[in-house]
Amino acid sequence: MNQIPMQYFNLAKENYSKYGLSVIQLIQIGKFYELWHEPDTSSKQQAYSQAELLVESSIRSRSLEVTPPIEQVASLLDMKIISLGKRSLLQMGFPVYSLTTHLSTLLDKGWTVIVIDELVTNKSGPKQRAVSQVYSPSCNLEDCPELPYVLSIYFSQDDLLGITLFSAMNGHSIIFPVSWTDRDKVTRLLISYHIREIVIWADSGVCSNILINKIYNLLIGWNLFPSEPNAKIEAMGEILTNLPCYLSYRYENNSKEWLLLHIYIGINTEWLNKNYQKYTLSKIFQSTWTENVNQANLISLLGVLQFIKDRNPNLIKNLQLPECYNSVVSPLNLILCNRAEYQLDLLSKRGKLGGLLNLIDYCSTAMGKRLLKFRLLNPITDYSELNLRYKDISIFKRLLNQKIFDNSELKCIKDLSSLHRQWAICASSDTTLPPKKLSQIYHSYLFACQLISKLTNNIQLPPLVGPQLKSLIKEIERIFQVDSLLGDFKDVIQPIGNLPNLFEQRQTLRAQLTEWAEQISNIVFQDTTSIKAEYFNKEGYAFSISSKKLTKLEHYMMNTSISNNSIIVLGKRGSHHIITSPTIHKVSIELNELEEQINIYVKQTYHQELKRLYFSYSELFLPLVNMISRLDVALSGAITAIKFNYVEPCLTLAKTQQTKGFIEAANLRHPLVEQLNTQEECIAHNISLEDKGMLVFSVNGAGKSTLLRAIGVNVILAQAGMYVAADSFKLRPYNYLITRILGGDDLYRGQGTFEVEMRDLSTILQLANYNSLILGDEICHGTEVNSGTAILAATIERLINAQTSFVLSTHLHQVCSLIDSPVRYYHLSVIQQENSALIYERKLKPGPGPSQYGIEVMGHIINDKKFYNSALKYRKLINWEPPSQGELTVFRPSKYNAQVFIDSCEICGAPADAVHHIKPKSEHKKLCNRKLNRRSNLVPVCSSCHLDIHRNKISILGWKRTPKHKKLYWVYTNESLDSGTK
């Protein structure tokens, strides 16, 4: 093996032990990046099912087959693998310029990309190469819609977890401790962040096997590790033989996103030293702030900083201080319990349609989209902040309706949060912010300035942001040639300092070369264009002449007596030769030196001025980003409100000091159902939960779960500061929203449906108070009827005593006879026709409704009359007597014609009380009763409409046939308007 492959595979071995199994190593060979693989070598990666990893290593079966990384990458990028012989290296690659294109694809699939570049030296001999960049899913500055975070967890020996969330893209970090017993609370926080890598730190004294399984179980509970037993997980090859100090895993989580897990057994002992902690963190954050921070938090933070530094030291420079908390739960938030965000479909499942966030997201900027998601997943209880958010939406709604504002400025603003972070890194290191990024920043500032100008007289904005932003724009325009930022780097600086003098010298030498070229061209070819003075990347300044004319020029120069007149051919470009001479070469050297001076001056000035501007205006950046995000979210809320006819919630104050949660809504709708289910009308409901809870009964499929979700989703919207899907909505904010809507077994914990129900019920009982909202669907349906009814009755009693707002759905009608406390009973109406067909009316009506209906629903789904009758027979045996209330309401037939049912009024839709003859009996004296009582002469009506008919206020014209159905035509006698109904 020659030197380059040997260097490549030695580096690969080193990087594998440092960065884990997910390494993809790209080496620059000329103008290409290549990935190599040695054939017939054992893979360092192994793969196991989730179930295999969770058992002891001694009883694990054989590992699963692992596809070599080069094959995975080739398939991912749709490229070919080549080999020059049977035992030759397997190779694949792509042009250097396309690295950025492929990088995001590789990072998205959980790969860590190592880039080995050729070094630029003036030495002859073999080219030198070295690692230039390390990109990992959470340690990169590539553009992406969501900020990637790395989660760092320190397992202390006293069962306290130190948690750090860190984003390299914008420098944001959060640290907080959590006890092992409260670990489930962390799930509520993590859902707001896009975690791509997890780093676990533990003391070397803990039992490794027990710790590893503890980590698996913790991450499964946080939805950061596959919960399916058959899920495939790639792991380091050493995991079977022993437990080393470092373990690495790559896998897809339950949301089908690729994650990397790194486990370090044994931490740096210096991290425990308080002097080291103080010195290191104050050096990074330019501040001393470690006195009141939990020790476990500091170790977790030091760990993640070391993790980031190992991949890119620049990413930990110029950081803002972390947000430090003593608890994972904020008292100012509405806490979503029992994973309410999933049960209420706040987020879309990966690869599937739906999700409330997708429905209401009309943000134009990446910053706004992130803030909208954060607000939706972290509703608040603060009255003043909520009213401010409602007011912002109201203002934008007015501006949109008046057509004096749109989102044109916001659409042109780039992700300033990420761009400012890149600027901060460059201001504190030797790296240079690309002019392209500066151009994005500058133009984003211009559009932000226009946005501020448009809104200054309409909405309250931070007073200093506008003036400071204008000042910064002027500074950028004074220093940089903003129209040339996307062009040649030499042109990005305005002619300031010594630059005009250098430009003048360069222009003089260029003019001299041009003059020589024109003189020679004029003498030899009698024109001024045959020979041109040009700059070439490789040859520098030289002359260009067509190949046909070169011979004549050489002949002329040989016959002249001018010294230093020999022509030197440097190369060829197409049909032209590049030539020089000793005299031209001398001037070319001077020009090249000048160009180098200009480049150095421009680069230094560019870097220095950007650094100066950053530290002069850095305090503007966060308020500016927050303002743009806030305006974008408010505009999105206004667009949503107009598009879907949402209303502003009305926050009401409590009559007493006890601020009990409260809802009163008119025509409340489910935002998702009314937009996604277009085949039928979305039924709205009136809801009031001020003094009594609600118990809802209904047939399966009538909409109980939809009703519960509609309440939960609209409460979250209101407490996130957005408009709601209703005609009116009064609210006193809640502190807890506890849902129990999705049921089923928990295979991971080995719990059946009833055990899962009781676990969720335990949460409900613990958190039930006057500021809790409980939404439960068929609680206690997983056990036998008597126990289920008793537990449900006890639950209702507890909730009433705790003054808790609740809406519970159930099929257990017996509970009504057990409860003496004040509860509102409702049912969702269903109409059963004579032929057993069901019509889901879905209207919320008072009372528990019919108590037995399962067989009727079954008969509607299973078209088997014999089976249906058999089920009815057994139900009668169980009831011991013919059930007087065992069936759904059947509308009675008319005494005039058994085919006409007295169901609903054909004029107004209210319940019908009678059947009216369209043509009265007096007109049919000569006709038989059969023609008088034909269906075409009969119409069911309510008592009110019947009275209006006989008072001649309504005239019925008769039934008419349309292409699809029969239609009753009628008119008010004082109107000519057709008021036909089906």
UniProtKB/Swiss-Prot annotation:
Keyword check for DNA-binding = yes
Return the CDD domains for the record: ABC_MutS-like, HNHc
GO BP annotation list: mismatch repair
Listed PROSITE patterns: DNA_MISMATCH_REPAIR_2
Q: Name one GO cellular component term.
A: nucleus
Signal peptide from the UniProt entry? none
User: Binding residues for ATP, per the UniProt record?
Assistant: 698-705
Q: Which residues form the HNH domain?
A: 905-951
Question: Which keywords are on file for this protein?
Answer: ATP-binding, DNA damage, DNA repair, DNA-binding, Mitochondrion, Nucleotide-binding
- UniProt xrefs under SUPFAM superfamilies: DNA repair protein MutS, domain I (SSF55271), DNA repair protein MutS, domain III (SSF48334), P-loop containing nucleoside triphosphate hydrolases (SSF52540)
User: Is Mitochondrion given among the entry's keywords?
Assistant: yes
Cellular location of this protein?
Answer: Mitochondrion
Record Gene3D superfamilies: 1.10.1420.10, 1.10.30.50, DNA repair protein MutS, domain I, P-loop containing nucleotide triphosphate hydrolases
What is the similarity comment for this entry?
Answer: Belongs to the DNA mismatch repair MutS family.
Q: What is the purpose of this protein?
A: May be involved in DNA-mismatch repair.
Q: What is this protein called?
A: Mitochondrial DNA mismatch repair protein mutS homolog
